[in-house]
């Protein structure tokens, strides 16, 4: 039986920290679904379609990654995709508290859904999409933190 995992997030935009997690996940699981949440409440800078396209290009070199948008409850999405592993990145203790709540709720909704927590490589442990956007808005150089296609798209958005 194939091990199918979901790595969900808003990915507004996808960063090299996210790519670090998804790349490592591809070595652990047969199929990884990079699930990009619509997240209208967060008022994303990029549309869902843009975020999916950016992530598809950024992960094109990874043969076992599928990038899809979703707006459903995570447990329902996982059930529909026949995945029982949820990948989550943890940068700090503050992330853990929130992620633990989500993991427990997801297990309540879908008992066979297991959460797997991965810490990003040290190089990416402090970055987030929000931080990268904020630095870029103030003309800071964020080239190192984003895939090339994403960096270009962010610069275009900020013009």
UniProtKB/Swiss-Prot annotation:
Binding site for substrate: 10, 42, 74, 88
Cofactor: Mg(2+)
Similarity comment: family membership: Belongs to the bacterial CoaD family.
Pathway(s) served: Cofactor biosynthesis; coenzyme A biosynthesis; CoA from (R)-pantothenate: step 4/5
InterPro entries hit by this protein: Cyt_trans-like, PPAT, Rossmann-like_a/b/a_fold
Site (Transition state stabilizer): 18
Cross-referenced Pfam families: CTP_transf_like
Keywords: ATP-binding, Coenzyme A biosynthesis, Cytoplasm, Magnesium, Nucleotide-binding, Nucleotidyltransferase, Transferase
HAMAP family, alphabetized: PPAT_bact (MF_00151)
CDD domains according to UniProt: PPAT
Locations listed in the record: Cytoplasm
Stated name of the protein: Phosphopantetheine adenylyltransferase
GO MF annotation: an example: ATP binding
Enzyme nomenclature, EC number: 2.7.7.3
Residues that, per the record, bind ATP: 10-11, 18, 89-91, 99, 124-130
Catalytic activity: (R)-4'-phosphopantetheine + ATP + H(+) = 3'-dephospho-CoA + diphosphate
């Amino acid at each position: 039986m194939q091990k199918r995992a979901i790595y969900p997030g808003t990915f507004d935009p996808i960063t090299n920290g996210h790519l670090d997690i998804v790349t490592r996940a591809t070595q652990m699981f047969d199929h990884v679904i990079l699930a990009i949440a619509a997240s209208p409440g967060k008022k994303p800078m990029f549309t869902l379609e843009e975020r999916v396209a950016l992530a598809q290009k950024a992960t094109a070199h990874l043969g076992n990654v599928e990038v899809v948008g979703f707006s459903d409850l995570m447990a329902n999405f996982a059930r529909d995709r026949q995945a029982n592993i949820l990948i989550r990145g943890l940068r700090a203790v503050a992330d853990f508290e929130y992620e633990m709540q989500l993991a427990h709720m997801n297990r309540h909704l879908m008992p066979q859904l297991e959460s797997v927590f991965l810490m990003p490589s040290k190089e990416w442990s402090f970055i987030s999409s929000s931080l990268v956007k904020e630095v870029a808005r103030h003309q800071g150089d964020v080239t190192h933190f984003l895939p090339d296609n994403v960096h270009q798209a962010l610069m275009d958005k900020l013009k």
